[in-house]
A protein has these predicted regions:
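Transmembrane beta-strand segments that form the barrel wall of outer-membrane beta-barrel proteins
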Residues: 30, 58-69
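Outer-membrane beta-barrel translocator domains and adjoining extracellular loop/strand segments
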Residues: 40, 73-75, 105-116, 162-177, ...
Length: 280
């Protein structure tokens, strides 16, 4: 078992890289209890994946491409690769996915105020570029019919760039003011996580003992630059820059001990330790 706390963008990328034939079942739990996480406060999407049954190597390659039919100023492509390998009690799996979004556009606005002899014209151009890269490598080893161990590594890179250029002209009572603005914003987001787990079946009724350890590192760097030049009635420049950073180290280990009292009831106990550090 592995708990993922994803943003909306990360969840979409994870689901897009799943193959339908690898999914055993999907459960949506609106209100999750402590049996899923000790500090659970929201809902849970529980995805159960199939194990590779046959030995050997199997894989899949896919490619998706989208574009705007109207002006072709927006496009998106998504290549992905899945590879799985099984030999005796050892199973290896890997996934690589990439998504690239590009969008350009603009707008023009012209206003006339007859009661105040005022004219305002504005022209804005925008360019948006974003990519999302995911990599996963994992293994499961069945020690025997009752015991198994596993390890998994995940990495995500998600850079985002947005550029906006604008020109505005305001004329009132014969006086004019022209402004030229430039905005550049970038966000570099990265995530790395490592998970190790051990599972033991205690009896035929379904009693189990599980231990899962997880380390996650998140890094987010933002850069926002904005410059405006005014000329005409007033002549001056305005420049601002904003560069926040945030780094998170998260380590968690949990052990679950489920005792089956009968075929229809069980006693679930567990212990969890979590340590979070943040630097921003």
């Amino acid at each position: 078992d592995r708990v993922l706390k994803e943003t909306g963008e990360e969840l979409v990328a994870y689901l897009e890289n799943l193959k339908a034939e690898d999914i055993l079942k999907i459960e949506v739990i609106p209100y999750a209890g402590a049996e899923y996480d000790a500090n659970a406060t929201g809902g849970v999407i529980k995805i159960t994946l199939k194990k590779q049954r046959e030995e050997g190597l199997e894989g899949a390659v896919s490619m998706r491409y989208y574009t705007s039919i109207v002006d072709q100023k927006a496009w998106n492509y998504q290549p992905s690769l899945n590879l799985n390998y099984k030999y005796n009690a050892l199973s290896l799996y890997s996934k690589v996915g990439y998504r690239r979004n590009n969008w350009t556009g603009g707008n023009m606005e012209s206003d006339r105020f007859l009661d105040r002899d005022r004219i305002m014209d504005a022209n804005t151009g925008m360019a948006h570029r974003q990519s999302h890269t995911t990599f996963q490598l994992g293994s499961v080893y069945d020690i025997n019919d009752k015991q198994s161990v596993g390890a998994e590594f995940n990495m995500t890179e998600n850079p985002y760039h947005n550029n906006t250029d604008g020109t505005a002209l305001a004329i009132e009572s014969g006086n004019s003011l022209t402004s030229q603005s430039l905005s550049r914003s970038t966000t570099d987001y990265s995530l790395m996580s490592f998970t190790a787990n051990y599972s033991l079946k205690l009896d035929t009724l379904g009693s189990t003992f599980k231990t899962v350890a997880n380390y996650t590192y998140r890094n987010k760097e933002d850069s926002v630059y904005y410059h405006t030049n005014y000329s005409g009635m007033m002549n001056y420049d305005s420049t601002s820059r904003y560069m926040p950073t945030a780094r998170y180290d998260m380590f968690a280990i949990r052990s679950d001990f489920d005792i089956a009292l009968s075929k229809s009831s069980k006693l679930a106990t567990g212990l969890k330790y979590q340590r979070n550090t943040m630097d921003n």
